[in-house]
């Protein structure tokens, strides 16, 4: 190839990567949009915040998570579930398109679902279609699948225990006094939930963009963390999605 042909190839590759990054950020936006109701349901239903105030509140904490959470989830998605060398632009496109499509379908029909599960399933399905099940990292997949099942059970157990404990502790208090304090405490719980949502789910998109950059040579396998712009843009995208949700 002459110099002009090489430059054209690099430029084409760059635009393919850029479009896939935009698609990943669209998924991240949809994640925030799709899951916004989970973050604000309690504070809106009890009248602690108006809907517009609640989404701004949740979006703020989605983004603030950037300063608190370590990038361990991004590392798992980016390097821990697929064998090196398997991922290419086609795999990333298939994974993102599948996850976005499922998110839109479940949102439209009002079906409770997880954007995280959709993304992990999309990645796994695209990789299996390309190279078979041997291309998956068994330890990473098993850990992810285990937590998919453990999380709701753990949430149910802890929620039940907390409800029993709170009812017992405040059994002799006047309802008006309890209501006053718990309306304030709901802000803390909603903020903590939004913080966790941003810190966990934004990192999954960071991970898939990092996976894409590694596959296309725009990042090195020796890098300990993804580029800063991916981190900032993903946290902004999920925050904006929540704001519009």
Describe the predicted segments one by one:
Residues 3-245:
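Multi-pass alpha-helical transmembrane bundle typical of ion/small-solute transporters
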């Amino acid at each position: 190839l002459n110099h002009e042909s090489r430059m054209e190839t690099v430029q084409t590759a760059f635009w393919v990567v850029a479009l896939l990054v935009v698609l990943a950020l669209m998924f991240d936006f949809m994640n925030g949009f799709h899951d916004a109701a989970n973050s604000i349901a309690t504070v809106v239903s009890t009248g602690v915040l108006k809907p517009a105030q609640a989404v701004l509140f949740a979006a703020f904490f989605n983004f603030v998570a950037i300063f608190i959470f370590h990038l361990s989830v991004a590392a798992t998605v980016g390097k821990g579930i697929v064998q090196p060398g398997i991922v290419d632009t086609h795999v990333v496109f298939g994974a993102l398109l599948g996850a976005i499509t499922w998110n839109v379908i479940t949102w439209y029909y009002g079906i409770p679902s997880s954007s995280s599960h959709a993304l992990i399933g999309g990645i796994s399905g695209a990789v299996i279609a390309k190279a078979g099940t041997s291309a998956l990292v068994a330890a990473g997949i098993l850990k992810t699948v285990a937590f998919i099942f453990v999380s709701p059970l753990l949430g149910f157990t802890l929620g039940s225990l907390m409800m029993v404990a709170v009812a017992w502790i405040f059994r002799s208090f006047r309802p008006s006094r309890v209501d006053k304090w718990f309306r304030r405490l709901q802000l803390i719980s909603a903020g903590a939930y939004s913080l966790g949502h941003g810190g966990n789910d934004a990192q999954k998109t960071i991970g898939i963009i990092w996976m894409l950059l590694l596959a296309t040579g725009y990042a090195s396998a020796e890098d300990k963390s993804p580029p800063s712009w991916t981190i900032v843009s993903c946290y902004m995208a999920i925050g904006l999605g929540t704001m519009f949700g």
